[in-house]
Amino acid sequence: MAAGAMPVESPRDATYLVEAEPVRLLNGRAVRPAAPGAATAMRTQVLGAPTYGDIDGDGDTDAVLFLVQDPGGSGTFYYVAAAYKIDGGYLGGTAVLIGDRITPHRLDVVRGVVVVDYLERAPGEPMAAEPTLARTHYLMLEADALTLVGSLDAGERIVEGWVTIGHEVQSFEPCADPEAHWLLGDSPALDAVVASYREARPVAKPYTPLLMVLAGSA
């Protein structure tokens, strides 16, 4: 979070850290010199409406938003930033770079996970090409900062549901689907799911359900 910043009424008026520089927005916009004495302006603005949800687990409704920064050159850089609900106002955090000249599609909060859907170019395509490759990034709060914890390729998705681990049963029941699915196979991801379950439930009885958010493809 920007040093010395105070909570404000709207996330569109908060101060965010973009590339380690504090950027104070006014009605979703900020303009400042690209460098001391430079004639070129650095423009930062909010893209679309903020998305609201609890990111830090304190029960308050935080906000996430797209920030677009035009440094006056050929690039247009897209960031995701969070504004945390504190003392009745919003305090801006550190912006996370998503890409240069991408096409943002969706910004959502799912059980504290920030989900970013966008289009980018395929590897090797020129920057002048229109973005057509669907991608998903997801971010979580780590050490008081929004952090990119992974990305999803086309066909992959994030699903929340109940994981049950016992002596003979390993199952996953998605919240949107009442039917339980067996967790089988030799994927390293399965080992990570089991390890996370046991870390979260170190003294729980076997077959105690645990709500988890899983990412990948079926």
Task: List where the protein language model places each region.
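Flexible low-complexity loop/turn motifs enriched in small/helix-breaking residues
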Residues: 1-55, 60, 64, 74-76, ...
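Acidic, small-residue rich beta-repeat scaffolds with periodic aromatic anchors
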Residues: 1-26, 105-158
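Beta-propeller blade termini
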Residues: 45-55, 103-115
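Acidic/hydrophobic-patterned starts of short beta strands in beta-sheet-rich repeat architectures
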Residues: 57-67, 112-117
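Structural motif
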Residues: 72-81, 124-130
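Structural detector for short beta-strands of small beta-barrel domains
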Residues: 155-170, 213-218
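OB-fold (S1/OB) nucleic-acid-binding surfaces
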Residues: 170-190
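Short nucleic-acid-contacting surface segments enriched for D/E, G, S/T with interspersed K/R
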Residues: 191-215
